[in-house]
Amino acid sequence: PLDSWFIRTTALRERMIELNRTIRWKPESTGTGRFGKWLEGLVDWNLSRSRFWGTPLPVWATEDYSEIRCIGSLGELVGEIDKSVAAGLMTENPYKEFVPGDMSKANYDRVDLHRPFVDRIVLVSSKGEPMRREPDLIDVWFDSGAMPYAQLHYPFENGGEKFRTVFPADFIAEGVDQTRG
């Protein structure tokens, strides 16, 4: 068996069941049957996949896994790379020109967080040890959850009031085979 990364979805099971009851499913049996039953039997979600193409997990770890770090933003990653450069684990910060908070295309053209580029980033642990990125990717269903943002290219364009008019989504069309989670 492969090592995997999970999201503790079971901690949210009751809340998701409660919210599922507020959705106007068409047909209704999808929400009470297929999807509702899936929620009732919910298990923790294995969100990692062993592939090359896709969204990389933003997780770095020491070789012995005594320290694991999940990076929450590009600004945080830039700061962590600066620490790694100062510790001598990297020679330069490839994202040093990135300006956190600047949502312009020009700013985001300065970075590529896909493989193989992100795999070249070595962070430094609290003990000065190298931390390498976990090689797995995020399950594409996790990407699908970004639909409300991606449809408007938010926050890079069409933010503010325009975004608020479509979030959260009022209608999502899925094939019945997609309603099992």
For the regions a protein language model found, what residue spans apply to each?
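Structured secondary-structure scaffolds
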Residues: P1-G181
